[in-house]
Amino acid sequence: MCKHVLNAQVSIRTACCRRWIDCIECHNEIADHPLLKTSELTLICKKCRKAFRIQFDQTMDESDEYCPNCDNHFVIDAITKVEKPKAPISPKLDLRMLNQEEKELEELLDETTRLG
């Protein structure tokens, strides 16, 4: 499972090291060499678990964006991990406490609002 592209529909077999990866970032994390780019790719569909090959060239049409076995659309916009927005700082919170150990705002509020 890819931690970079959350909706990866296929796994890609690399030509350089023959490993199955979900994205280029995954390859860069596990390999000590750059990714070898080729025009032909071997893929495994994550829906039907069957392997197939595609040729990336100038004549690709819309039908080449689907798995030939189950018609799963694998050329889609990637959904990547989005950072959680930080909560706004309450005017009641003492700003000097924000620098203490870089704590989350929720943790600071829990500590400062305790009674007794």
UniProtKB/Swiss-Prot annotation:
GO terms for molecular function: zinc ion binding. Zn(2+) 2 binds at residues 16-17, 27, 33. It holds the Pfam family zf-CHY. It is found in: Cytoplasm. InterPro entries: Mito_Tim_assembly_helper, Znf_CHY, Znf_CHY_sf. A zinc finger (CHY-type) spans 1-72. Zn(2+) 1 binds at residues 2, 4, 23, 26. Zn(2+) 3 binds at residues 45, 48, 67, 70. Its main location: cytoplasm. One of its GO terms (cellular component) is mitochondrial intermembrane space. Keywords: Cytoplasm, Metal-binding, Zinc, Zinc-finger. GO terms for biological process: protein import into mitochondrial intermembrane space. PROSITE patterns: ZF_CHY. Signal peptide: none annotated. PANTHER family: CHY-TYPE DOMAIN-CONTAINING PROTEIN (PTHR28082:SF2), ZINC FINGER PROTEIN (PTHR28082). This is Uncharacterized protein C3B9.05.
